[in-house]
Amino acid sequence: MDRSRVLEQLIPELTGLLSLLDHEYLSDSTLEKKMAVASLLQSLQPLPAKEVSFLYVNTADLHSGPSFVESLFEEFDCDLGDLRDMSDDGEPSKGASPEPTKSPSLRSAAADVPPPLPNKPPPEDYYEEALPLGPGKSPEYISSHNGCSPAQSIVDGYYEDADNSYPTTRMNGELKNSYNDSDAMSSSYESYDEEEEEEKGRQPKHQWPSEEASMHLVRDCRICAFLLRKKRFGQWAKQLTVIKEEQLLCYKSSKDRQPHLRLALDVCTVIYVPKDSRHKRHELRFSQGATEVLVLALQSREQAEEWLKVIREVSRPIVGAEGLEVPRSPVILCKADQDKRLSQEKQNSDSDSLGMNDSGSTLGRREACEHGKGKKNSLAELKGSMSRAAGRKITRIISFSKKKALSEDLQTFSSEDEVPCCGYLNVLVNQGWKERWCRLRCNTLYFHKDRTDLHTHVNSIALRGCEVAPGFGPRHPFAFRILRNRQEVAILEASCSEDMGRWLGLLLVEMGSKVTPEALHYDYVDVETLTSIVSAGRNSFLYAQSCQDQWPEPRIYDEVPYEKVQDEEPQRPTGAQVKRHASSCSEKSHRADPQVKVKRHASSANQYKYGKNRAEEDARRYLVEKERLEKEKETIRTELTALRQEKKELKEAIRNNPGAKSKALEEAVATLEAQCRAKEEQRIDLELKLVAVKERLQQSLAGGPALGLSVSNKNKSQDTTNKPQSNAPEQSLPVNCVSELRKRSPSIVTSNQGRVLQKAKEWEMKKT
């Protein structure tokens, strides 16, 4: 085989081998040898202009001393003499001689350059100049002198901080530390911009330690750099930023083993803000939902585009078997909001104390912090409540095997299983949200760092004499405040509307307040969310009241034996015996003696109070429904007009052109008439619904009942004629949800249906 052809095959094979070695951990000597081979390959086959990221210019005379670049090649011997004996698969033959031989091509190449000079220390006047990179080519990869470098560090360029162990050379006229044998090959560079040198002189340099360096932090990473991260109050701090395994990790120092911030990129939104007169830096802003969780500053637009490219590759969805895009990590959502917004790695605030006490000190300012809590990772989302329940059981088993638990601990665990008076809440601490396990006990709210550590609590609030007020701005619709003497004691946030309603009901009972969840004023929530909060709050409020009345066990429905119902007036007793199915909305009752005669009145029942909040809620709902129906009505009217116009044109065509096509035109006219009739029926149904909604809207705006609690004059007269003596028995009957629903008046739609249909039919008769 021809030697030139062998060289042509050898160069790509060596290039592939070097690319594979870039991903391996190499020692110092092996790394230097690899870089020497890479330099030889570059001299044989130069890289394209776009991939050349550095250039060294040696200004020293050849006779004044050896160049460090030249001295690196002296130890490298390329065995090219035995290339003829190489087999086709690239393995050397057994008879190959281990002695290196010089090829004629190498001899001719060696004759063009001066012979190598002996290794001597460089003269004092020797220096090398490095041409700086182009604009935007900022260093991004960091390597230590122990030889562990991240992937593709040769192409992208990185820098190393020198230490005192290297010999000194004169760089640009000043004594500086050199890199000895790795200076020329490490694609490092020196910046000669005066402003950058002054800025570097003011700021401490980040340097990897020699042996104990955490180089595993940047191993197998997609991209990493020391970037400026925006802190809470606008300051900037330089931190090591790494993208690894679909996550963005921030380390305060290169010596840290654990990241200061961990951010899942597949659930984040990234916005690039270029540098301009308003923004002094190129910024990447990471947000989760409506919360901005991280801001990074980059040195150039090219660097920002490179980071954005890596982020897009990381967060790109996976294509499933059926061609559908599947997200890389599951994000579990409930109907209205997220089921639980837990976070395992959150941004630590400056202080771990809650900053509140019984004297009424405030827990934090009203302004929401800029960095919200991060979302929990995919593993915790998949576990959910089942893993928490399993963890609780395992904790109980382990604690029981180690030592016998106290009666108080057993009572605590049993109360967690039976009574829903505990759960996770976000607490505002020093303008930062922290997640705490909150527990209600003996009119006191306890805060724990975790649900497994119930022996100690971070802080507690005595709830007697306090008030609760929902709302903490539009960004936190599920937040509520605990007030004492009109001063904020704590600001808490629930995970969803049901959880917020449950806590409001429990807190109102523990505070001893007579205010119900329906009477509270809710802001920053829509009608559906408000209904969910009020419903959950009412249920938990009545549930907590029944538990406070010494019920042996909580029940939603309980059966009571037949009991005689007595009226307040002893002269008119009733002998009716009723089997009562009391719901959680009924009055409080004691179960000490189940055969006791209970006195129940319909007037004393806990009927639904149609208050101001409920009226406003119904008014908003009916207003939205009215607008929707009017839009549908206009749409149907437009379609009817178009159909009638088309039918009119077809009839004119039939009159003008009687002939063979008239039959087809008549069939088209019949089809259009059928469509017109169907649209007309839809319009009549919409008219019926619209009239009913308008009447309900008027009643809700006037503050009247919209749920049938009071009837019209016509219905009242009918009820009085049918039941002339219904006053006395109704006052003595017990409350039953089914009977109350049956006694309600018929809906407004049925009372107005005949009249509207009659008018619609009259209108149709007039049209025809």
Swiss-Prot record:
Compositional bias (Basic and acidic residues): 340-349, 587-596, 759-768
UniProt cross-references to PROSITE patterns, sorted A to Z: PH_DOMAIN (PS50003)
Claim: Coiled coil is one of the keywords in the record: yes
Biased composition (Polar residues): 165-185, 350-362, 710-734
Coiled coil: 611-701
Main location: cytoplasm
Subcellular location: Cytoplasm; Cell projection, Podosome; Cell projection, Invadopodium; Cytoplasm, Cytoskeleton, Stress fiber
Phosphoserine: residues carrying this PTM: S87, S93, S97, S103, S153, S329, S343, S747
GO terms for cellular component: anchoring junction; cell projection; cytoplasm; podosome; stress fiber
InterPro entries on file: AFAP, PH-like_dom_sf, PH_domain
Keyword Coiled coil: yes
SMART domains attached to this UniProt entry: PH (SM00233)
Alphabetized UniProt keyword annotations: Cell junction, Cell projection, Coiled coil, Cytoplasm, Cytoskeleton, Phosphoprotein, Repeat
Domain of life of the organism encoding this protein: Eukaryota
Record-listed Phosphotyrosine modification sites: Y557
PANTHER family: ACTIN FILAMENT-ASSOCIATED PROTEIN 1 FAMILY MEMBER (PTHR14338), ACTIN FILAMENT-ASSOCIATED PROTEIN 1-LIKE 1 (PTHR14338:SF1)
Assembly and interaction partners: Interacts with CTTN.
Protein name as catalogued: Actin filament-associated protein 1-like 1
Source organism of the structure: Mus musculus (Mouse)
High-level lineage: Eukaryota, Metazoa, Chordata, Craniata, Vertebrata
